[in-house]
A protein has these predicted regions:
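Non-catalytic, mostly N-terminal accessory regions of nucleic-acid modification and defense proteins
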Residues: 1-10, 15-20, 24-41, 106-115, ...
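Conserved Class I SAM-dependent methyltransferase catalytic core
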Residues: 153-212
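Long, N-terminal intrinsically disordered regulatory "head" regions
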Residues: 63, 141-143
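Short beta-alpha connecting loops at secondary-structure transitions
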Residues: 79-82, 122, 144-149, 209
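N-terminal functional modules and adjacent low-complexity/disordered segments of proteins
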Residues: 1-3, 9, 35-37, 71, ...
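Conserved catalytic motifs of ABC-family nucleotide-binding domains
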Residues: 133, 143-154
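Aromatic-residue hotspot detector
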Residues: 55, 116, 149-150, 211-213
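Conserved S-adenosyl-L-methionine
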Residues: 30, 34-129, 134-136, 154, ...
Length: 213
């Protein structure tokens, strides 16, 4: 049962990455009047709340199929992927997960850090994330102190959305899993949503329906 669950989760994650890629490709081809576009191919990608590295591994599998060029494959394995998580055990599991797929053999691409209080100036061309939802009871003060540009809120999902908006490069692409509340809540969430719609090109919203078994 456990193996089946892991297999299902990985398949869903890979499917999500493909959906993100296809959505961006369709949008870009429309903008460029039908020209093809490789949107997640051999660029630096990150997951700021990577968990055990499912999105990163799925992104790797997707990019690996795009070219057999040795130098591109080497770049992909050693320089293309970055992840972070604030739980030490999870970081170890993510590093091991990628290592078993020959990724980051010399140096793990997974950092043990809280992305919401990280003040580094690293920017990324592609961001894939399924951040934790809910209220951040601990650490809200640190977020406010380290990220004064953020709209102040204790909602994890809204803070991660703000973080993602701050680290995506101009012309970059983002695929992020968020709860419906990000689309409907008022207050701080509405302020962040307004900034998203004003300063970024939001072109695809997919809503997953859940079956109750």
């Amino acid at each position: 049962m456990c193996a089946q669950k892991l297999s299902f989760d990985y398949a869903q994650t890979l499917h999500t990455v493909r959906i993100v890629h296809n959505a961006h490709s369709v949008h870009r081809s429309r903008v460029q009047k039908g020209k093809s576009c490789d949107c997640i191919n051999f660029v630096r990608a990150t997951d700021p709340a990577c968990g055990t590295g499912g999105f990163l591994l799925a992104a790797y599998e997707h990019m690996k199929r795009q070219s057999k060029d040795i130098e591109k494959q080497k770049f992909l394995k050693n320089h293309a992927l970055f992840g972070a998580d604030n739980t030490a055990l999870v970081v170890t599991l993510a590093s091991m997960n990628l290592y078993l797929h020959d990724i980051g053999v010399n140096k793990s691409p997974i950092a043990y850090q809280d992305s919401l209080i990280d003040t580094s100036d690293k920017m990324y061309k592609v961001i894939l994330a399924n951040p934790p939802f809910g209220i951040r009871h601990q650490g809200s003060v640190e977020v406010a102190a380290n990220r004064p540009e953020f709209v102040k809120t204790s909602d994890n999902q809204v803070n991660f959305l703000q973080h993602i908006m701050s680290i995506v490069k101009t012309g970059g692409r983002v695929g992020v899993v968020l709860p419906d509340s990000v689309l409907t809540d008022t207050g701080a969430t509405a302020q962040v949503r307004e900034k998203l719609l004003k300063d970024f090109n939001l072109h695809t919203i997919l809503r997953k329906t859940w079956r109750i078994l």
